[in-house]
Amino acid sequence: MEDENILRNAVNLQVLKFHYPEIESIIDIASHVAVYQFDVGSQKWLKTSIEGTFFLVKDQRARVGYVILNRNSPENLYLFINHPSNVHLVDRYLIHRTENQHVVGLWMFDPNDMSRIFNIVKESLLR
């Protein structure tokens, strides 16, 4: 089982590096995530067309970010998390305020993934 996980992580890292060569390592994975964007004008969450596997990653400059390999189209999502205060856990959503002040909501199918990923993000950014 452990050999299987090592192989799966190696294959996943190869796929991510194909799209984003600067990725150095995978920190954690969640199997299914849907992405929402907060619309300031209407004060509502809008579901985007991006959903798929979530990879918490570290790049060559030791920045923490995430990639969502989109199952619906070739448009993936790759964002960095610059500061622990930019990430919050609200209900079943991981809320991320991006560098350009957009607000992204990530809904994870498994609630255990949500809290685990949130804690790892906070811990990684505080190092």
Swiss-Prot record:
Single GO cellular component term: nucleus
Keywords per UniProt: Cytoplasm, mRNA processing, Nonsense-mediated mRNA decay, Nucleus, RNA-binding
Main location per the UniProt record: cytoplasm
Cellular localization per UniProt: Cytoplasm; Nucleus
UniProt-listed CDD domains: Dcp1 (cd09804)
Gene Ontology molecular function terms on file: mRNA phosphatase activator activity; RNA binding
BP-aspect Gene Ontology terms: deadenylation-dependent decapping of nuclear-transcribed mRNA; mRNA methylguanosine-cap decapping; mRNA processing; nuclear-transcribed mRNA catabolic process; nuclear-transcribed mRNA catabolic process, nonsense-mediated decay
Highest taxon of source: Eukaryota
Keyword set includes Cytoplasm: yes
SUPFAM superfamilies tied to this protein: PH domain-like
Similarity field: Belongs to the DCP1 family.
Subunit structure: Component of the decapping complex composed of dcp1 and dcp2.
Biological function: Component of the decapping complex necessary for the degradation of mRNAs, both in normal mRNA turnover and in nonsense-mediated mRNA decay. Removes the 7-methyl guanine cap structure from mRNA molecules, yielding a 5'-phosphorylated mRNA fragment and 7m-GDP. Decapping is the major pathway of mRNA degradation in yeast. It occurs through deadenylation, decapping and subsequent 5' to 3' exonucleolytic decay of the transcript body.
PANTHER family (alphabetical): DECAPPING PROTEIN 1, ISOFORM A, TRANSCRIPTION FACTOR SMIF DECAPPING ENZYME DCP1
Protein's name according to its UniProt entry: mRNA-decapping enzyme subunit 1
Native source species: Schizosaccharomyces pombe (strain 972 / ATCC 24843) (Fission yeast)
